[in-house]
Amino acid sequence: MSPALWAMACGFVLRVSSMPMGVFCRMTTVRRADLSCVVQAGGLSSRMGCDKARMPFCGEPLIERVLERLALVGSELVVTTSRPGELAYLEDREFDGLVPRVVMDIDGPAGAMRGIASSLTAARLPLVAIVACDMPFVSPELVGALADRVKEGPLDVCVPREERGIEPLCAVWRRESCAPAACELLASDRQRIRCLIDRVHAGYLDEPQIIAAAGSLLCFENVNTPEEFAAAELLA
């Protein structure tokens, strides 16, 4: 292993917790009948140099790894993308009994709000988990805890919040209230996800609750460069 890769892998670990790797993602959860899980794959992957959604991660396309994890907690799988033809093959695949739908991003200015609005309008179930395609350690247990918090609140969105800030691309939203608000913000080209969070009834899961559900903070790590991708594979 090169010194650079070793340093990157150590950096991943230092950013999460000192817990054993075996509990980073526990992978035991209950499927929620009212939860759609939407994976966003509309980015340009400019820092990666190629489409990271389809890059092999430990032998399988990264997006398939994410879908496999989310299938444990959701009752619908959706992929939103600006290039549906490249991911159409996913509609011939099955993940824990669920076949994903691949949906084109809605029209509007490019940016984060377009992704959120596309995800919320594509989903068919009342609650919507929106997750980026480049999060190889996404925790189904955490997604389930977020969904439960939205229902119990009741809230319009529950967002993980840790020392580095909020994690809006691993949050659960209430479709009925959040989809119209997201589309309205998109129409006025207000791209910051914080604008949507501030407009609706939001709640948060803080770091102790996140770790109780997911085992650590590794679930938020994403891979944007070849070096980060290789380092993440060492931890998988």
Task: Enumerate the predicted regions with their spans.
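Low-complexity, intrinsically disordered regions enriched in charged/polar residues
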Residues: 4-6, 97, 223
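Hydrophobic alpha-helical membrane context
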Residues: 12-13, 20, 146, 186
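Short, basic/aromatic-enriched C-terminal tail that caps enzymatic domains
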Residues: 219-236
